[in-house]
A protein has these predicted regions:
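A short beta-strand-turn-helix
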Residues: 28-52
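Conserved helix-turn-beta segment immediately C-terminal to the redox Cys motif
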Residues: 51-53, 68-89
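Conserved redox-active cysteine motifs that mediate thiol-disulfide chemistry
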Residues: 58-72
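N-terminal signal peptide c-region/cleavage motif recognized by signal peptidases
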Residues: 17-18
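Structural microenvironment flanking redox-active thiols in thiol-disulfide oxidoreductases
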Residues: 89-100
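Short pre-active-site segment immediately N-terminal to redox-active cysteine/selenocysteine motifs
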Residues: 51-54, 58-62, 105
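Non-catalytic, surface beta->alpha helical segment in thiol-disulfide oxidoreductase systems
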Residues: 105, 110-141
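Bacterial N-terminal signal peptides that target proteins for export
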Residues: 1-8
Length: 141
């Protein structure tokens, strides 16, 4: 019984410490997208609403390449914690948003710098290519 209690305590310590340090990918609804990224219903010209550059992953739950991209984005979220934000938009749940951006292929990534126009990349890209895009498009290094 004593060992069981120790395991429980250790489990919760690990669980909470992982949550404190991990920068998670955030899932967005259409309404959240409008306030955090761009309100396409009110503005015709692109105006990024965020203070930190972001990547938006337009995906679906059944898409094989989307599933392979997800852990890469999680890793990048941790590597660039505080420098960029990574959002995910489920195109089947947020059809209006996907249609507004002309998303016809998944995964599609939208790279949004704080200043300037966003850039789109389609398909499953290697981590190194994504890192290069983050450095050049979002962080302007």
């Amino acid at each position: 019984m004593k060992h069981f209690k120790l395991y429980i305590v250790a489990f919760f310590c690990i669980l909470f410490s992982a949550e404190i340090y991990a920068e998670d990918v955030t899932y967005l609804t259409t309404e959240q997208f409008k306030t955090r990224v761009f309100d396409y219903t009110k503005n015709k010209q692109w105006k990024y609403e965020g203070e930190t550059p972001c990547i938006i992953d337009f995906y679906t739950t059944w898409c094989g390449p989307c599933k392979r991209l997800s852990p890469i984005l999680e890793e990048l979220s941790e590597e660039y914690c505080g420098e960029i934000v990574i959002y995910k938009v489920d195109t089947e749940r947020e059809r209006e948003l996907a249609a507004a951006f002309g998303i016809t292929s998944i995964p599609t990534l939208l790279f949004c710098p704080v200043e300037g126009r966003p850039q789109i990349a389609k398909g499953l890209l290697p981590k190194e290519v994504l890192k290069q895009a983050i450095e050049e498009v979002l962080l302007k290094k």
